[in-house]
A protein has these predicted regions:
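Phosphate-coordinating loops and pocket residues in cytosolic domains that bind phosphorylated ligands
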Residues: 7, 44-47, 118, 152, ...
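Conserved tyrosine-mediated DNA breakage-rejoining catalytic core shared by Y-recombinases
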Residues: 94-96, 152-193
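Catalytic-site neighborhood detector that most strongly recognizes the C-terminal catalytic loop/helix
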Residues: 4, 107, 168-171
Length: 193
């Protein structure tokens, strides 16, 4: 059954990926994939079974990236099953519905930008308090650093007027190499930064 094979496959995910990815994979399988196909035999699994998982998630309003991740999980699982000679099933037609939309990003507006540089307080439980991280927020806006890169920044990363980005800290407090290969980079500080 798929649910039994999933346990084996997930053990390989744990060995080969970071904690953040493991949590995301486990969550998608627990909430979306296993309830739909967990009781099926791997030999009776069809591409439509997998597409139904994606379509149901789409109708529930999941963002395009989440749907892509669902597809990637199920493709990786099928590839692992093929490697173990459990099936020859290859879901090549599995796709994200055309109407799927990316999650919108909230862009900092000019009036909010002015406020960021004029005010050093934040609302905390309905009260205005001094924000200890105000300079970090300003630095992030001026440099374009991702939040995890900002947390991972060390004084040793600044040499002269150049900042070398080589690490990030994820939501679990783990040090990583960054979001992708482009995350390792260097830039010259502006006068304002």
């Amino acid at each position: 059954r798929v649910e039994d094979l999933y346990q084996e496959w997930y053990a390989t995910v744990v060995k080969t990926t970071g904690t953040g990815n493991q949590r995301n994979v486990e969550s998608r399988w627990r909430t979306r994939i296993l309830p739909a196909i967990g009781r099926k035999r791997i030999t009776s699994l069809t591409e439509q079974d997998l597409q139904d998982v994606v379509n149901d998630a789409y109708s529930d309003g999941l963002a395009k990236k989440s749907l892509q991740s669902l597809c990637a999980d199920m493709r990786a699982f099928c590839k692992w099953c093929r490697a173990k000679k459990l099936t020859t099933f290859h879901p090549e037609g599995l796709h994200v519905p055309a109407g799927a939309r990316p999650k919108g990003k909230k862009v900092l507006q000019p009036d909010a930008l002015i406020t960021l540089f004029r005010v050093d307080t934040s609302l905390y439980r309905g009260k205005r308090v001094h924000d200890d991280f105000i300079h970090a927020y300003r630095f992030q806006v001026l440099t374009g650093l991702r939040p995890g890169e900002l947390v991972g920044l060390r004084w040793a990363d600044v040499k002269g007027g150049t900042v070398f980005i080589s690490r990030a800290v994820n939501v679990l407090g783990e040090q990583t190499r960054g979001k992708n290969d482009n995350a390792v980079r260097a830039f010259v500080l502006s006068d304002l930064a």
